[in-house]
Structure formats: structure tokens, C-alpha cells
UniProtKB/Swiss-Prot annotation:
The gene is pfdB. This is Prefoldin subunit beta. Keywords: Chaperone, Cytoplasm. The keyword Chaperone applies. GO terms for biological process: protein folding. Coiled coil: none annotated. It is found in: Cytoplasm.
Length: 126
């Protein structure tokens, strides 16, 4: 058993690919969660201000004076967008987990069959 059969090598490669995708997805999800928390915090703080209070919003490296209500509306839209993105990432994460479990079961089955053949074949294809 010096070398794994191509089918098992392929399954291992697929599992590694799914693991890499899951890791990238987790990083994206963490970033979106952080942005959502920041946006929620800004929204909550802005709600505490009086109507008509001077408000500034960032535009690149600039701070621009804006209407409080407009900024609240913008923050609400951002929150909604981040929520949608987070739900989408969670669904992708579930699909990847399902795919990983499926590949893992296939690999276990293939390895079990390979071990079941034992050394009787001498590792040669006939």
C-alpha cells in the first residue's frame, strides 16, 4: 500500500478543497459580523442624539456634514445588507459542511473497501 488509488487521492483533494473553502468562508463571515456590530453600534449611538443635531459621515478620508435622518436611514440599509450577507454566508457554510460530511463518508467507505481487499491482491491491479 505504497500509493493510494486515484479515487481516494481525488476524494482527499476534494476534502482539502472544501476545508479551504470553509476556512475562507469563516473569515468572510467574521468580517461581516464585525461590520454589522460596528454599524449597529453607530446606529444606536446616533439614535441617542437629538433630532437636528450636527452629524458627520465618513466618505473616504473626509467627514461630510449630513442630516441625522439620512445617516440613520443609510445605517439601517447597511444593517439590512449585512444581515442578508450573513444569512447567505451561513447557508453556504451549511452546504459546505454537508458536502464535507458526504465526502468524508465516501472516503471512509472507500478506505474500508480497500482494507477489506487486504494483501491478497498484492497491491496490483488485475
Amino acid at each position: 500500500m505504497n500509493e493510494l488509488p486515484p479515487q481516494i487521492q481525488n476524494q482527499l483533494a476534494q476534502i482539502q478543497q472544501v476545508q479551504q473553502q470553509a476556512q475562507a468562508l469563516m473569515q468572510q463571515k467574521a468580517q461581516v459580523e464585525m461590520l454589522l456590530r460596528e454599524t449597529e453600534r453607530a446606529f444606536e449611538e446616533l439614535q441617542k442624539t437629538e433630532e437636528g443635531a450636527e452629524v458627520y459621515k465618513g466618505a473616504g478620508e473626509l467627514l461630510i456634514k449630513a442630516k441625522r435622518e439620512d445617516v440613520l436611514k443609510d445605517l439601517e440599509e447597511k444593517k439590512d445588507n449585512f444581515d442578508v450577507r450573513l444569512k447567505s454566508l451561513s447557508r453556504q457554510e451549511e452546504r459546505l459542511q454537508s458536502r464535507f460530511n458526504q465526502l468524508q463518508e465516501q472516503l471512509k467507505s472507500a478506505l474500508g473497501k480497500m482494507q477489506g481487499q487486504g494483501p491478497a491482491t498484492g497491491g496490483r491491479a488485475e
